[in-house]
Structure formats: structure tokens, C-alpha cells
Amino acid sequence: GFSLEGVVAEYTAMRPAVQRRWQAAPGTIDEGITDIVRFDEAIDRVLSDSIAWYLSRVAHGRDLFLGVLGHDLRTPLGAIAMSAQLLLRDESLPERSTKPVLRIFNSATRMQKMINDLLDFTRTRLGGSLPTHRLPAQLGPLFRHTVEELAALHPDARIDYACEGDLSGNWDVGRLEQMMSNLIGNAIQHGDRAQPVSVMARGAEDTVVITVHNHGAPIPVELIGQMFDPLTQGALQHRQSRGSDSGLGLGLYISQEIARMHGGDIDAQSDESTGTTFMVTLPRA
């Protein structure tokens, strides 16, 4: 029933205790040194084996947890979303039923996104990494498709999109689409709905720079550096207080992980006069 820290602490305490007993025992110095060296080697070997066993159990638990989330939760949600989508396409659906069915579809879609975010969070926090598959691709059509999907999902929001320069590179297009969906969705959720969300992708010599900007109440200065940490309670409370659709608050963290796995990063700026801007810098290679 030991934790990893407890195992290391026990072996750490054992080593000096045994060495002190050897020092007090009769015998030659050479014999004592030889025994101590052998003892240290044995302790190091047992400690290494114990850590390896512990990490294998952690990996097993992680894989089991991800399997439950990935199958047992996503499967029924997928069935709900698909059924709602089929009903929405049915021309015989009464008009009074359209709004409730659309609400079911949107809620199921939002839950699927939360589960995907939780899966990614669990992978990264339990020692894993996000699975990636990078290929040569153009980001312009991908981002335009993402903007169109979010505009359809949020008909009361306006999204302005523009791109310039070369947006080609080696990208995991699925992950970058996920990142853009998170950032734009965050801007829609926390921004002023009376003003548009602005999305800009610009190709530079060695990088592609993406900005997502929204007007509205600024992020407090003391929280700017914490917005990408899902375990910072203050940042979570701030995000959750801004609307009922805040979800798990993992979107920004996962977006930063996606940018970093491409060798880039995300910065945030926010003030009363200009609003909030998230800027993603991605190297092409």
C-alpha cells in the first residue's frame, strides 16, 4: 500500500541506517567498504524494480480509465447525437419539436467535446502524450471549415475570418482543428456577442501565426499566466463564472499542448480597451 514517494522514502531511510550499523561493527575497512558497495547496488536495483512495477500499474490504470471513457461514455453519446441529427433532417418533424431536438444535439456534441478534452488531459497528466500524425498540409481550408462549423453551431455569434501568406507546413490537421475550435469557442463564450470574433492566420517566413480576438470583459492581469493551467482554481472559477457552458475548463490547456507538440506556443493578452487576444505561433517544420 505504499505510494511512489513512500517507497523512495523507505529505501532512502534504510540506506543510512544500515550503513551506520556497518560502521559500528568490528572488521577491516576494506571488508566494510566492499559490503557497503554491494548493499548500495542491491538497494538501487530493488528501488529501480519497485519504481518500474509502480509505473506499470499507473500505466495500466491510465489505459483502463481511457478505455472506459473512450468507449463506455462516447458510444451512447454518439447514438444520441446521431439520432437527434436524423430527426433534424426529417422534414415531417413538427416545427415545435425542432428547438428541443436541436438542444439535444448541441448538448450531446458539447458532452462529446468534454469527454475528448478529458481523455487528452488524462493522457498528458498521467505521463502520456497526445497522439499525433503530422503530414504536409495547408491550414487555410481547414481553418475556414472550422469557422463555418462553429458559426453554424452558434448562429447568434459573428465570426470574421481572414488569412494571408503561405499557410503550408507539416501539421497534424485534426489536432490543429481541435485547437482552433477550442480557441474560437472560448472567444464566443466569453466575448461580447454584439461584436464579432476575429480570426486571422498569417504565414511568415518560417512560421504561421494565428490570432483569435474577442471584445468584452478582460481577463484579470493576475490570471493571464494561469489561464492555461486547468488545476489553478482561480482561473477555473473565472472561466466558469462567465457562462453555463464552460465545461471542464480544459480547452486552453489542451490547445497549448497541441501548439507545443508542433514546436510552438500560445500567448494571451487582455485589457479593457482592446479586448482579449490569443496568439498561436507554429513553426512550419
Each language-model region and where it sits:
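Short helix-loop "hinge" at the ATP-lid/N-box region of the Bergerat-fold HATPase_c
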Residues: 187-188
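Conserved glycine-rich
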Residues: 263-264
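Conserved catalytic submotifs in the C-terminal HATPase_c
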Residues: 133-136, 158-168
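Short alpha-helical Gxxx[C/S/T] motif in the catalytic ATP-binding
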Residues: 251, 255
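Short alpha-helical segment of the dimerization/phosphotransfer core of two-component systems
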Residues: 106-111
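Short conserved segment of the HATPase_c
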Residues: 219-231, 236
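Long, amphipathic alpha-helical coupling/dimerization segments that relay conformational signals between
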Residues: 1-66
